[in-house]
Amino acid sequence: IVGIAGATGLLLTGFGIKDSVSGIVEKQYSEIYLYDTIVSLKDNEVSDGAREILDGDSFDGWMTVMKKSTDLMAGDASYSGYVLVPENAEDLGTYINLRDRKTGESVEFTEGSVLVTEKPAGLLGVDVGGTITIENESGRRVDFTVTGIVENYVYHYLYISPELYESEMNEPFEPSEIDAVCVETNGEAREAIAAQLQEQEGVATAGFTEDT
């Protein structure tokens, strides 16, 4: 967590919170992110070996996502962030706590949903029903209507359902990351699992959020 705090301190959202930077980051990784394992992929596919490990007794579920850095735009404003697309829309709320910061109520994410995290929504002056623009790989700008705004403290995110992303961006879903829940609590066991994942074909890196 200290490593994350040092690298992302300038991107953290305050909202009047008086906690230390490390406290804010801990909130992100204990309350917002419900997964604790991150596997980065090299070839946009999950190998059979990785699937076997993730489907084993050491894990309590996982989701595959496509995450790309992008500029989030509205009007004349533009901020660097990420677009994140889950392979299955219903998975996102299982592994990320999609909630309204002020009310604590869950925010729906289904086919056709587009959620933006709270800080960029404020910076861009966008509310539910507003429009955020991103560029596809060919440089064409694509508008997305925001269906919800969710709590988040590290980086700026735009969550788009896979069907909508593929149809509007004219690009296929290509997985770049696996987010998983590891049930092992022993440090040595977790290290062994990460090393085993790291050895699998197509895996670039594997580790735990607590060690990032």
Segments and roles (model prediction):
Residues 1-2:
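Alpha-helical transmembrane segments of integral membrane proteins
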Residues 6, 35-45, 68-70, 180-184:
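Conserved short loop/turn motifs at secondary-structure junctions
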Residues 6-35:
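Alpha-helical transmembrane segments
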Residues 27-31, 36, 47, 51-61, ...:
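Short beta-strand boundary microenvironments
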Residues 32-33, 108, 149-188:
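Small-residue transmembrane helix packing/gating motifs
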Residues 179-182, 187, 191-212:
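A cross-kingdom feature of multi-pass membrane systems that activates on extracytoplasmic/periplasmic
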